[in-house]
Amino acid sequence: MFYPDPFDVIIIGGGHAGTEAAMAAARMGQQTLLLTHNIDTLGQMSCNPAIGGIGKGHLVKEVDALGGLMAKAIDQAGIQFRILNASKGPAVRATRAQADRVLYRQAVRTALENQPNLMIFQQAVEDLIVENDRVVGAVTQMGLKFRAKAVVLTVGTFLDGKIHIGLDNYSSGRAGDPPSIPLSRRLRELPLRVSRLKTGTPPRIDARTIDFSVLAQQHGDNPMPVFSFMGNASQHPQQVPCYITHTNEKTHDVIRNNLDRSPMYAGVIEGIGPRYCPSIEDKVMRFADRNQHQIFLEPEGLTSNEIYPNGISTSLPFDVQMQIVRSMQGMENAKIVRPGYAIEYDFFDPRDLKPTLESKFIQGLFFAGQINGTTGYEEAAAQGLLAGLNAARLSADKEGWAPARSQAYLGVLVDDLCTLGTKEPYRMFTSRAEYRLMLREDNADLRLTEMGRELGLVDDERWARFNEKLENIERERQRLKSTWVTPSAESAGEVNAHLTAPLSREASGEDLLRRPEMTYAQLTSLTPFAPGLDDAQAAEQVEIQVKYEGYIARQQDEIEKQLRNENTLLPATLDYRQVSGLSNEVIAKLNDHKPVSIGQASRISGVTPAAISILLVWLKKQGMLRRSA
């Protein structure tokens, strides 16, 4: 039977991609349905209990700047907050928070259940309704059919998921959850390129069986960082430390002696695992010269005795896992409460997607999260938000939107996936962005919130706070530009005490702030320039904008040069065999990828700058040279 009410957008899956997609579509006023096999696992952290990190924290801030959920949820659930790379430049500083799994899940579910225009329904999906190469709905396991103008697939590791522990394996979506086999088979019938990937997770340890007294503690930062631009540290629950132990030669011997029982090394697992989150087996074999690896013992929550040993992801048999765990300092009597495992699952070639994350072959069908070949909650959340907002726009007969590489890490992520594809689980790093000085955590709202407002993602409260911050930045910069001190002034001595070289001529507040030895806090403690801003976010922007003004201006020039041809559109129906002068290799690659713009075409391996020039000349001659807004 058909459900009586049609929807604008259906989201399939309630993980980090699905929850952001559902919230985005509903915030934009579209009638949205979130289908999940279990309402109790909405926002579940399937692997590590943490949000953020290098590159990943940047994505979380961008999701937040667009009105998303993840940063708000972790502010309510984070039990240890740190700024990574705090001693380095602002471009690579990143926020990371240890999470209480239960509090995080509760925060996500509460937000979903209180979001207007959003209905949540518990049923696994087994089929899609596709008519004339357009998706028009979904069918659940009990045969209930839902109609919609757009469908977003965010099914994580559930498609034909298979768990491996040693040489034993069984079908599962993740530990404790069933796989989605009928939907996997249905999707394989569609004109989509499907492959397999794998990821893994470590065994969980009973904290009561660990001797923490012999281990080094790692505390969070004080003052505590905050993730959301709308958040504050008073929202954070109780803060707790993590602990550090190490593997040793005994650990490594155990692993080497049991490699024949590893499903990866025995050839049982075909899928490729994440390069930047390798199993302990991989680490021992790939870095054979190292006699130890650092392991972080991370609490899973304030009311849980489970510890997540970050760094020993493994699919070795359980008896070997016990030996590995007990070989490490402080863990000699440790008990495992959940075994580690590897999971293999279907993923779809993201080169078959438009930058909006809509399928090139099935109209109205969007893909987000691990099924696009990514790894990590943050990468999934960012894709979910983008897919959800574009599904909402499609259902409202509006054009799609995707950020440029120069605009957001989300733009880098999507462009990398849709242009280059991936053969291994993709994770975000700051090094992937060529314009990272412009794409900082601290300015994510300045880059994206205005666009979020135009798209209908940003509510009145966030918009008012954003504009207040902009006004504070502008007013303070004007104040510092127009406030001067001279070498003969009464306050010159006070100023000189903070300088490596004394004043030799008149200087404004901005002149002084540009000096590497002068911070904004120091400057505004001096009589001529006091008081400083109470708005900490605006104060941070003033300092960064002034100190890095020259570098930022130079990078902005680079972006503008690059954008001259970046946004030149390529017709979807263009047969590149018509373009004389292109090599057969370039023609084949362009016809295979069907890039949407010159910028995307230029990043395809083998497409040379000369080929791009030929293409631009041809487009001009044909009168087809046009740029996107």
Swiss-Prot record:
Pfam families for this protein: GIDA, GIDA_C_1st, SAM_GIDA_C
Keywords, alphabetical: Cytoplasm, FAD, Flavoprotein, NAD, tRNA processing
Cofactor: FAD
One GO CC term on file: cytosol
PROSITE patterns listed in its UniProt record: GIDA_1, GIDA_2
Family statement: Belongs to the MnmG family.
Biological role: NAD-binding protein involved in the addition of a carboxymethylaminomethyl (cmnm) group at the wobble position (U34) of certain tRNAs, forming tRNA-cmnm(5)s(2)U34.
Protein name as catalogued: tRNA uridine 5-carboxymethylaminomethyl modification enzyme MnmG
Organism: Citrobacter koseri (strain ATCC BAA-895 / CDC 4225-83 / SGSC4696)
Upper taxonomic lineage: Bacteria, Pseudomonadati, Pseudomonadota, Gammaproteobacteria, Enterobacterales
